[in-house]
Amino acid sequence: MNTKFIFISGGVASSLGKGIIASSLAKLLQARGLRVTIQKFDPYINIDPGTLNPYEHGECYVTEDGAETDLDLGHYERFLGVHTSQANNVTTGRIYHTVITREREGAYLGKTVQIVPHITDEIKRRMLLLGQTGDYDVILTEIGGTVGDMESQPFVEAVRQLQWELPEEDCMTIHLTLIPYLHAAQELKTKPTQHSVQMLQKAGVKPDVIVCRTEHPLSQDLRRKIALFCNVRPGHVIQSIDAWSIYQVPLNMHEEHLDELAVRKLQIENFNAPDLGRWKAFLERLAHPAHEVQIMLVGKYVELQDAYKSIQEAFVHAGAANDCKVRVKTIQSEHINADNVAELLAGADGILVAPGFGERGLEGKIHAVRYAREKGIPFLGICLGMQMCVVEFARNVLGWKDAVSTEVNTQTKHPVIDMMEDQKKTTIKGGTMRLGAYACQLEAGSLAAGLYGTTEISERHRHRYEFNSKYLEDFTKAGLKATGRNPQTGLVEVVELPGHPFFIGVQFHPEYKSTPENPHPLFKGLVKAALDNKK
């Protein structure tokens, strides 16, 4: 069987959930026994999201191979339970960078380099790249942005060309639109969808299926109307009604026969109905928890929920695994001080201090760590959160009041967190951190080893600073133990506080590897400890 390609575009408005629809369809096809992956093509000029402000773009998701990518790749991995890579996320900036570099190298032999064919050819090359590996039966491609946007035009043109270049049975296009509901008139309006599809068709792309995001069910009359004016069959107009959880969407799409439409259009034969047993079991636990805990998430980007998307989702997975609803309350670390920390963190069954960069909000994180340590509240610190564990312990247990990270003060007498040696000569910010999966050796008998069930693990990283090992003996004698280290470099990856109910800081990002069917052990452990603390 040839590799099949499904292209998913969006219209009317942004943030409709193309990534969730793509992930849901991919999950259904995977559940039929097909080998599936998803790729995201983003229309912004940045090479990657690594240097983007989380307030603008949400979380930067890191893959196993160290690519800094769009947060939608997190959805792809969580739904499918398989790894993505640099090849799964492409931006306009990366496309232009490649083409311009080739032009400088003389690859175009003096020709005038243009959007068509040079940019579109590079887009098409990357769209087809994963299909040439032989690893996948179906590749879904999400086109970022909204149809009609200037930035998206080269991508839509590339899809138009591929529709003609690929065999008809190897290519499918899906268009996601919004059906707004007018409360005054109490009716759903289809005109924005009609106009969006017309724009797509003017660009030469005819959608095979229209997915309509809606707050209210679509009647058969409305579906027929959309089909008539958008030039598709009535059965190819399906609704994506607002769901109580994003993890319910695959089941909703199955009820709407989206996977069946895809299998028929792509002429995929001899595959069974989707096996969604484990997925449904997860949803059942998620929908009917027996317990509830409150976790305080202390961070500096809390105003935008997407800034900590993977952490939020990891708590969903861990909650279901513990038959527990996890209420995550976000606390702006800038607002925390010694006088109000008890008030702001009152009611916490567990505390997580989030990753981040820069000086802003650090003191608030340190106060939160101290509160968790002294009050015996289950605690997890991630990346910068782990580093603040070290700083807090140095100041308040070892008595080094000036202890801090050199990210904040290069002149401190106690640089307990310091820049990694291989980072000190780096001046370029984009893509130069310690990124991707690295091995970690856990100490036998430690809390971490007990949670993981092994002493050899691999986790993903995104940082420039590390625990300063010259102070390791001081910390160990005072009670903060380094229980996880990189086997090659000795870099401290995990610190724990024996005697505390649950106190662990990790330099890596465990949230990136949590999925509904395989919740991450650190998050499961924190939620269980929070439950025990509540009792």
Language-model regions: role of each:
Residues 1-327, 333-350, 357-358, 365-371, ...:
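Flexible phosphate-sensing "switch/lid" loops adjacent to ATP/NTP-binding sites
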Residues 10, 40, 214, 241, ...:
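Active-site proximal loops enriched in glycine and acidic residues that flank catalytic Cys/His/Asp
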Residues 230, 262-270, 397-401, 526-535:
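Short, hydrophobic alpha-helical segments
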Residues 13-19, 23-27, 31, 344-439, ...:
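Cysteine-nucleophile active-site neighborhood
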Residues 304-307, 320-324, 338-341, 360-364, ...:
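Extended hydrophobic-aromatic, low-complexity segments
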Residues 56-64, 243-247, 353, 374-380, ...:
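Short beta-alpha connecting loops at secondary-structure transitions
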Residues 435, 439, 443-535:
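C-terminal and late-domain segments of enzyme folds
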